[in-house]
Amino acid sequence: ITKVLPNENIIYFGDTEHLPYGEKSKEAIQSFSRKIIKFLIEKKCKTIVIACNSASAVADGSVYRVSASTPIYNVIDPVVKEVIKICSDYNIGVIGTKATIGSGIYESKIKSECSTSNVISLATPLLAPMIEEGFINEKISNTVIANYLANPVLKNIDHLILACTHYPLIHKEIDEYYKGGVNVIDSANIVAIHIANELKKENLLNYSTKTEHHFYVSNYTKSFEKCAQFFFQENIKLEEVNLFV
């Protein structure tokens, strides 16, 4: 989003107290999401992105109804919209957390618009914590990735959806594993372009060249700050805010 919309001020909230979301119940994730959205509305955000596939997968009306006027977007619908354009008669693989895969949301949304496609999903729960710990482009990460992708359920796929916002950081390694034989679909750029188009449509784009980003977490740790700096490629400082008293 910061690359596609460089003039926008970003307020990021990472719920580090409850990581990983992929292991939490639907009800717990919905409760956390509602409180975070309320916090972002109080910060006068003009648009809110649920930048997590696990949270997006289980977001229900109670989550979206937190705001009557602020648009709330998930990271699943824009990707599904793009996949539907190319889905006919293809085998589409999906990898993500247990919560995302267990929800079956990608299968149901894609199949509802493209009944001829074959959607195969695989939970890959070790990938997100591996990335958070900084194991990227190393022997360990390559081994873990290869073990998951070699699973027989993913055999003969034509496209692979990276259904976790962490996974773009290992896109290169996944591409290298497939050696061009599979089209790896990175959600990050798709979602960012969708948000940019929506802001433009609503005349909400910011054209100022002076931007200010704020990064909040529910539980500060030095390791997550280091991880966040790796994600954003800048020297950022995290501010702890306890929303869950």
Predicted regions and their residues:
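Non-catalytic structural scaffold of enzyme domains
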Residues: I1-V245
